[in-house]
């Protein structure tokens, strides 16, 4: 039987015989998601090891703290791209359920990367890439939520938290009920990964965008 969580995501009875394929998709997407583009970009551009800069995170916000907007933008696009590619390829080959499994795998790969001892990023860019691939309007709405929050408060982590928590709502608004479960799960993981940031936001000590 297909577990109830996947039935909620939209799996059909025919998938009962396809679990080896779903597991393979999950693993392949995880390995793709594990590629630490922030670290690779910063080293390739001669900016050093981004893990030794600022927050030590491998995401675009911390790459920006190297002073290179180009490196930060490239990291953002690549981290988002790996989530989108995983979803699009899986959907093309096996359909919507496989696409959601691939999105989960890519996200887990980014936050728990095999290549860095399972110490990765916070998953925001990858999450947005996954949303854009699953449903472009939902992804765009979440991106605009991030942008609006960032412009008003100038705090990247707060913008990420608002974008994450808005995603399941946008999925529901656009009628993607079978994908809302995935959105809730990934949003919850993003909030957990930002626990230290949340404490700093509450205390008023969270750095502004472009500052260390």
PLM feature spans:
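Hydrophobic alpha-helical transmembrane segments
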Residues: 19, 23-27, 72-73, 99-104, ...
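Transmembrane alpha-helical segments that form the membrane-embedded catalytic/substrate-channel core
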Residues: 31-38, 103-114, 190-197
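Cytosolic, membrane-interface loops and tails of multi-pass inner-membrane proteins
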Residues: 39-71, 195-212
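Short, non-helical or kinked segments that cap or interrupt transmembrane helices
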Residues: 48-60, 116-128, 155-163
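Multi-pass membrane catalytic core of lipid/isoprenoid biosynthesis enzymes
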Residues: 65-91, 102
